[in-house]
Structures are given as structure tokens and as C-alpha cells.
Amino acid sequence: MSSVTAVDADGRLPLSSMLATVDALLPLSLLEAVRDVDTPEGVLEAEFVDELRNKRLGLSDTVYTQIKRYSEAVRRNQRTAQDEAIALARLIGRRPDAEAVLRAAGRFLAHEAYMTISPPTRGMLRVLPSFVSRPLALRKVRSIARRYLNGNVRRVGTYVLLEIPRSITVGVAAGGAGCAFYEATLRELLKLLVGTTGAVEHTRCEGRGEGSCEWRADWRGAERAAERSQAA
């Protein structure tokens, strides 16, 4: 097993350490997505299941073992080498369904990170007026992005900007599909925190030679659309 690093509850480490490692939830999310996508629906014959294990990566003993390993690291609040996550992302990037798997991984990470927020706080985010809940939600997005994505979040007007100084998925799949992981994470996280999400745009991409990757989410757009619909 590769070395792991323990962190505090807020995931606070020096920036150099943060960029050299990732929270174990990140590689776990990639593997859980592979397993989920590769698992067929319904009850199957035992012989067919054995055959699938040989053909589908997500059902292999290797993936099962690695999921157990990363799950234990998550339980222990540990980080692992970023190169491991990059290797997993590249492996997924060779699949024809790479974008779908990466989006599923992003949603998984967002949900698991959201569940680390205390139930009372999650409840307050749902019932408090937006002028109170939005700043609280933004603080949670910042904390989650820093800990689980090695990312930086800031607000500009009605937009939330997520910057990833070193993406683990950039260039892993054709057509920039690798970046779908972070887009899906941000979209799902905002949906869970504030109930609605407007458009999420990939405004800057490392793969296009534009420096670090950046996404812009209009987290008030969907809310305004819902208000107009109710008024009509």
C-alpha cells in the first residue's frame, strides 16, 4: 500500500502537500463509478456473473480490493498520492464510456462530501432564507473543494468559480471529456447544498493551454427560473 497522510477535519495542509496528494475519497469515487457502471441490473446467473468479472473492470477482484483499501483510508481521514488518482483516471479515459464514468464519479464524490456536513447544517441550508443560507453554502463549497479536489472557490456576482490548479483528469479522454469529472462534482454539490443549479461552464482549460482549469456555475440561474415559473 502506498503511503498516506492524515489530515485534520478541514483537510488543511500546506499547499505543496495538498497538490502532491489527494483525499482518498477522490480515487475511491473513480473506482465506485467504474463498479457502478459495470454492474448489470437485475439478478444474473452465477456463471454469467463469473464471465462478467473477467470482462468488466468494475467487477474484478482488483477493483474490489482497491475499493476496500480506499474506503478504509477515507474512514481514517487519510490522503494518498495524487499520481495514483491520475493513473486511475487515465485507465478510465481509455474506455468508450469514459465521460459517463467520470460524471458518475463526480456525482459520487459530491454526495459523499455533502454527507460529511452535519445533519443540522444540511437542514439549515434547506430552510433558511437564501441571503443567510447562500454564504453558508459557499463556505461549505470552498471547504469541500479544497479538501477533496485541491481546488479554490470564489464568488463573482451570481457566479461561483471553481479553479483546479492541477487536474487529475485533464487530457485523459478524447475531446476534453476528462474535465467532466469536476463539472459533475460542482453541479451535484451545488444541487445538494442549495437545491438548484444553473448553467455550469468550463471557462478555462489546462488542456487548451489556458493555465489551470476553471468552471463557472450560475447558482442563482435555476432559482430565478423556478421563481418565474411559479409566478406564471
Positions of PLM-derived features:
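Short, surface-exposed acidic
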Residues: 61, 197-200
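Short, non-transmembrane amphipathic alpha-helical segments
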Residues: 178-193
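N-terminal accessory segment detector
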Residues: 1-159, 168-177, 206-210, 223-232
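Beta-rich nucleic-acid/ligand-interaction surfaces
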Residues: 199-219
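Short secondary-structure junctions
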Residues: 142-149, 190-198
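General N-terminal targeting signals
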Residues: 119, 179-181, 215-217
